[in-house]
């Protein structure tokens, strides 16, 4: 998909609903469309120890490990765009645990309620001292996040699914504090725009 993602409102809504259905199904079936979650984790760079830590929150739908490259520091605030079941939120939370009384913060936003249900359930099972973990329902093109409120924005194989990528990136930069950092793992189509038939193919929505 191109960066512009210029479509009509009806096309945007259709594409968004296709993606929502695909990921709701993944959340309920606890499986990746690309590989088994365990195999997918190995392929994209999570360490064995990280795999054990995140447990059932990783459904194998990412395409990288952005928290490995974001240079996260204790006490920072991190936002994960399209957090799914929370894998990168939990990994970020562990890295930004506060010290000397300053708490870290890890916030995930996703438009799929079923994914957020899994993320919140996993959060209740974990012990994460020195950091606040939160999940919010929302869309990347209109984030339910305050302006200039986070130090780092991460995203894992989600922005490519947005029909309006410019809006999603504008929102990411709106949420960042001055001097903040953006670390994204994603897939990019070089060259021509994808045909409409591929954009609306539910089998490719993951």
Language model regions located:
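Acidic carboxylate diad motif detector
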Residues: 184-186
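N-terminal auxiliary segments of SAM/dcSAM-dependent transferases
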Residues: 2-43
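A short glycine-rich, Lys/Arg-flanked "PGG" loop and its adjoining helix->strand segment in the class I
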Residues: 97, 166-181
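Class I SAM-dependent methyltransferase SAM/SAH-binding core
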Residues: 74-142
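Short, glycine-/aromatic-enriched active-site segment of Class I SAM-dependent methyltransferases
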Residues: 188-206
């Amino acid at each position: 998909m191109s960066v512009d993602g210029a479509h009509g409102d009806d096309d945007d809504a259709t594409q968004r609903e296709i993606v929502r259905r695909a990921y709701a199904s993944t959340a309920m079936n606890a499986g990746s469309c690309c590989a088994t979650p365990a195999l997918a984790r190995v392929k994209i760079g999570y360490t064995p120890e990280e795999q054990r830590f995140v447990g059932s929150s990783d459904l194998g739908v990412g395409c990288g490990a952005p928290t490995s490259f974001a240079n996260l520091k204790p006490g920072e605030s991190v936002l994960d765009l399209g957090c799914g079941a929370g894998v990168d939120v939990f990994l970020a939370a562990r890295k930004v645990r506060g010290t000397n009384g300053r708490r870290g913060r890890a916030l995930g936003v996703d438009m799929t309620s079923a994914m957020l249900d899994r993320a919140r359930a996993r959060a209740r099972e974990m012990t994460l001292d020195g950091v606040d973990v939160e999940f919010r329902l929302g869309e990347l093109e209109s984030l339910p996040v305050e302006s200039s409120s986070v130090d780092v924005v991460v995203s894992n194989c989600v922005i490519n699914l947005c029909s309006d990528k410019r809006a999603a990136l504008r929102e990411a930069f709106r949420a960042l504090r001055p001097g903040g950092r953006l670390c994204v793992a994603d897939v990019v189509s070089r060259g021509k725009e994808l045909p409409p038939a591929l954009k609306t193919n539910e089998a490719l929505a993951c």
